[in-house]
Regions:
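N-terminal targeting/secretion presequences
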Residues: 1-193
Length: 193
């Protein structure tokens, strides 16, 4: 199809969505309190997608991959995100050409893990992916990433060299959430720093 859709402004207010696959335990739910997209373009013929900005405010998303009760801590079979807020500008996608400026991202997960900030740029061309400075913060941890990844290094027969600088300060509280169920004496003995 060679359709071109111009999306001047899309606003969602208080939209709920639920999906359960027949004969499967997969369940998805979402509640979008507010979401908006401005100056969007979907060009199906050129396979090009772009938007000036995309925002989500105070929304909730959940994924359950089975009927079992969630494990203590971070359980990838049961993800529940609340208080999701994000603001992304300069969005562009066409093949290997990608651009996004993440201005804001905040979310809380069922396990207690909180992302208090995620900001930075992600861009790529036909040669490589660039992450010039991505910052991830929780109330207890901070991670900074700078990376250059040639597309050729992701192929079946990799070529080229990835370059990445990762600086991280991980808080005890976040590590214990990620680890899940641990003996209390181990938790007490684990150093704070």
């Amino acid at each position: 199809l060679n359709w071109v859709l111009k999306l001047d402004k899309i606003s969602l207010d208080r939209v709920a969505f639920a999906l359960q696959m027949p004969s499967d335990s997969l369940r998805l739910t979402a509640f979008v309190n507010k979401a908006g997209l401005n100056n969007g373009l979907v060009d199906l013929g050129a396979e090009q997608y772009k938007a000036r900005n995309f925002d989500i405010t105070n929304s909730t998303f959940a994924y359950d991959g089975n009927y079992a009760a969630p494990e203590q801590g971070l359980d990838f079979s049961h993800i529940r995100l609340t208080n999701l807020n994000t603001s992304i500008d300069s969005i562009f996608y066409q093949g290997k050409e990608i651009n996004a400026h993440i201005k804001e991202f905040f979310v809380e997960e069922r396990s207690g893990l909180k992302v208090s900030a995620l900001a930075g740029n992600v861009r790529s061309d036909h040669e490589q992916i660039d992450v010039p400075d991505l910052l991830l913060q929780t109330p207890n941890s901070e991670v900074r990433l700078t990376a250059t990844i040639p597309w050729s290094s992701l192929e079946d027969h990799p070529q080229g060299s990835m370059k990445a600088l990762l600086n991280a300060s991980l808080g005890k509280e976040d590590l214990l959430i990620a680890a899940g169920s641990l003996p209390e004496d181990f938790k007490k003995a684990y150093p704070d720093k």
